[in-house]
């Protein structure tokens, strides 16, 4: 999914600030 792709692109931010974890 797009969320997963974005999450991989910015792993450092993933789950910290982004609404999609």
UniProtKB/Swiss-Prot annotation:
Q: Which organism is it from?
A: Polybia paulista
The beginning of the lineage is: Eukaryota, Metazoa, Ecdysozoa, Arthropoda, Hexapoda
Positions bearing Threonine amide: 21
Processing after translation: Occurs in oxidized and reduced states which are thought to adopt a compact globular and linear structure, respectively.
Name assigned to this protein: Paulistine
Q: According to its UniProt record, which protein family does this protein belong to?
A: Belongs to the sylv/frat/paul family.
Per the record, the domain of life is Eukaryota
Q: Which UniProt keywords apply?
A: Amidation, Disulfide bond, Toxin
Name the cystine pairs.
Answer: 7-14
Any idea what job this protein has? Induces transient hyperalgesia and paw edema in mice. Probably exerts its effects via different pathways in an oxidation state-dependent way.
Q: Which GO terms describe its molecular function?
A: toxin activity
């Amino acid at each position: 999914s797009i969320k997963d792709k974005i999450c991989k692109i910015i792993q450092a931010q993933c789950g910290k600030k982004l609404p999609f974890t």
